[in-house]
Swiss-Prot record:
Mg(2+) binds at residues 185, 299, 302-303. GO terms for molecular function: metal ion binding; transferase activity. This is FAD:protein FMN transferase. It comes from Escherichia coli (strain K12). InterPro entries: ApbE, ApbE-like_sf. Homodimer. It is a lipid-anchor. One of its GO terms (cellular component) is oxidoreductase complex. Its EC number is 2.7.1.180. Residues 1-19 form the signal peptide. Keywords: Cell inner membrane, Cell membrane, FAD, Flavoprotein, Lipoprotein, Magnesium, Membrane, Metal-binding, Palmitate, Signal, Transferase.
Amino acid sequence: MEISFTRVALLAAALFFVGCDQKPQPAKTHATEVTVLEGKTMGTFWRASIPGIDAKRSAELKEKIQTQLDADDQLLSTYKKDSALMRFNDSQSLSPWPVSEAMADIVTTSLRIGAKTDGAMDITVGPLVNLWGFGPEQQPVQIPSQEQIDAMKAKTGLQHLTVINQSHQQYLQKDLPDLYVDLSTVGEGYAADHLARLMEQEGISRYLVSVGGALNSRGMNGEGLPWRVAIQKPTDKENAVQAVVDINGHGISTSGSYRNYYELDGKRLSHVIDPQTGRPIEHNLVSVTVIAPTALEADAWDTGLMVLGPEKAKEVVRREGLAVYMITKEGDSFKTWMSPQFKSFLVSEKN
């Protein structure tokens, strides 16, 4: 099995569709049957719910979706040595490196949100991710030493990466030969937005699409109601609902520290790495959900906020006016917090 972004393959998404897969009830004669297409990409699942398409159209669309997502993976993967991203990473050149417009846009958004989170959302943290065993490298047999961490930190930093936009070509440029860009924190969000654009190109105006924990939507579901998305409780029980939201044509993404981890020397190590310390996070923030104009933005914000921890994250949320829902672990229970902007999307919440 190929895993493109995370060591744990096919993790259950921290967000899932609500009520969009059910067949129309007989009493609701106006309802339109929803077709659900599914597949695998980037070490996780993709899914598309689309009302009112027939079997032939479904088969054609599924093939187009998979082809597009395979291309996205070939663009962004750190597990494919011949991906566009890995060719940049493996190059020691400090000269401008030509990239696609999509790659330039992803990196530009990541750098912007990285700056707004005081460097907490850092796409150059790849050497540390690999050091701790959450990238293509094997898991370490012991916790890395401070010397190893410092050596990897010296190869990171958003200030070492620049996007150059010219009229007909975009470039990435690094000023450290060993700079290693890892876009796994935003790959799902970009792919979900890309799926939404594919739906539009195909003339589909009602859809809910997801890649892993990032979703995008437009229009109404099969019953003529807003698409609803459930946020999972941060437990090992799948599909346990914490809250339900109407995303109303926005992007949504959740970052969680409770699923992708391993234990070493008696310590539970999260896959979320703090660029400042070079170590997995240890605070009590276990889930961050962000609703934003695009899934890419939501995916970038949720990572940065997760790294910051609850109090610093709240400061950024208030300063930037973000729609955010956070869950912290308090002893044996969980506590939730949401920004005023998030409340307008909330349908229900469970204690």
